[in-house]
Amino acid sequence: MYAPPFVRAFGIAVLAVLPSFSSPATAASLKSSGSSSSCRCFPGDACWPSPADWKAFNQSVGGRLIATVPLGSVCHGTTYDAARCADVKAAWPYADTHTDSSSSVLAPFFANQSCDPFLPRETPCVIGTYVQYAVNVSSVADIQKTLAFSQKKNLRLVVRNTGHDYFGKSTGAGGLGLWMHNLKTYDIHDYKSAAYTGKAVTMGAGIQAGESAATAFKQGLTIVSGICPTVGLAGGYTQGGGLGPLTTRYGLGADQVLEWHAVLANGSEITATPTKNSDLYWALTGGGGGTYAVVYSMTVKAHANEKTTGANLTFPNAGSEDVFFQGVQAFHDIIPAISDAGGTAVWTVLSKALSVGPVTGPNMTKATMDSIFQPVLQKLDALNITYSYSSGEFSSFYESNAAYDPPVVSNGLQIGGRLVKRSDFTGNPDGFIQAIRGIADQGGLVTGASYQLSSSLQHPPNSVNPELRKSLISFQIGVPWINTDWATDLHNQDLITNSFVPALAALLPSGGSAYLNQADFREPGWQQVFYGENYEKLLELKDVYDPNGVFWGRTTVGSERWAETEDKRLCRVS
């Protein structure tokens, strides 16, 4: 996940508390709200597996079944422990608190206040929208047995790794999770095919960006990934496209994939490459995670370490707002130049400051980076704006990123997004400034990730939204999560859907598109906005490889055929 600078440690009661924002389907359009086979079996239903069923299943997977105990349980009821509760609250903003859990999620909206550590002690601790159980996957056999059990018992299946997800795809009420987090194999090897000859890495689905980067660096290599070190690479990040700081240099994360190793819904083990099972390869490579098959490993290109320059720039809104946004515009003016020089940039505009960084320049000198920023610094001097600018040249991307992308604490942000082409951005500079200013004035923030995908970057055909390839910037519009004010959080989600995203969409032809990993889960017309012209073909392949809809997540291909009822059970839509 290409995470905004204020969200990188984030690429989130009673079940009915969560408003039914996730689907346009109404209760009347659902085939059933009970235990009919049109709905996934739910705790309390007659069809729910018995304790003996769960025991037998646990034995079949070598004792790797985990019954969910929410992290917040130490803050409630008979399990209350004041010291441990304080520790959980203090650790809650850190990604590692959640990524090593078999049930927790980093997008708190989709936890739905389930056993929330910030609710009063007397509030009952319920599993709520967390998965009921998860299998700590260690082998293909674990995946196959879990798929078979979930279908035999008509259970909701959730494929999860780290819980990094803005759409709640990593959890589900009444769900059985396939927890891929501990598949940590990492094999660097030589690779030869018609499409690519060179170094490659075959990594397990549990490998996270930071682990990959550190291991590859020691071998003189760089692997394309996002910024956030705790994001799992083989899941939604790469399967959803894979924007990152090396996009301009090497292409998207999806463009690096040489092979997918997966298990289909029917339990068949399969390898997909550009020449073998090529239709599945095409769908997995950009068509969204957790949709067509369970990926247990992937093989990707590995690139030699090379000189990389990093940079940061920050300045406050310390006086006139008009003057501050003139400074923001000065930075906007150099974004195309950063891309043209082979670099990428990430920045965030808030009402009180602009924070730019990391700016990443692979194969770029410090002198080149400084020359690109010179017009901005001159403008800031002329405006009498105090700023901090730093740049440095390193022998590798790994070292540059370590210096210019320090970890940020935040696990809460509700977001929307839009992709913006160069011509739209440079052709209406005042329009974008006014839209961003309006969002910031209402307590929101706007993060941009700039890049440029050249046609000279060769890759096999894949299902990445063509609009992502044509764009200069992926904008994310966010509102920080407030752990202690649910009503305000719900209001802020409405702001994103009904005000903030439309403000940017109004500046774009036909309302624009969005990067499917970082957008509003309530996006109207998400099929076109997230997947573009590829949606119909992807839907056809969904029917080929998952005809019974075993894999489901909000805004995944084919997800409109299912919806959650008021109590969050998953049912087919009539």
Swiss-Prot record:
SUPFAM superfamilies on file: FAD-binding/transporter-associated domain-like (SSF56176)
InterPro entries linked: BBE, FAD-bd_PCMH, FAD-bd_PCMH-like_sf, FAD-bd_PCMH_sub2, FAD-linked_Oxidoreductases_BP, Oxid_FAD_bind_N
Molecular function in Gene Ontology: FAD binding; oxidoreductase activity
Keyword annotations of the record: FAD, Flavoprotein, Glycoprotein, Oxidoreductase, Signal
Signal peptide: 1-27
Pathway(s) this gene product operates in, as recorded in its UniProt entry: Secondary metabolite biosynthesis
Protein's UniProt keywords contain Signal: yes
Glycosylated residues in this chain: N58, N112, N136, N266, N312, N363, N384
Pfam families: BBE (PF08031), FAD_binding_4 (PF01565)
FAD-binding PCMH-type domain location: 126-305
Disruption phenotype: Leads to the accumulation of dihydrosorbicillinol as well as to higher amounts of oxosorbicillinol.
EC number assigned by the record: 1.-.-.-
Domain of life from the UniProt record: Eukaryota
Cofactor needs: FAD
Protein family membership: Belongs to the oxygen-dependent FAD-linked oxidoreductase family.
Function according to Swiss-Prot or TrEMBL: FAD-linked oxidoreductase; part of the SOR gene cluster that mediates the biosynthesis of sorbicillinoids, a diverse group of yellow secondary metabolites that restrict growth of competing pathogenic fungi but not of bacteria. Sorbicillinoids biosynthesis requires the action of two PKSs. The SOR cluster is required for the production of trichodimerol and dihydrotrichotetronin, with sor2 being sufficient for production of trichodimerol, but not dihydrotrichotetronin in the light.
Name of the protein in question: FAD-linked oxidoreductase sor8
Gene from which this protein is expressed: sor8
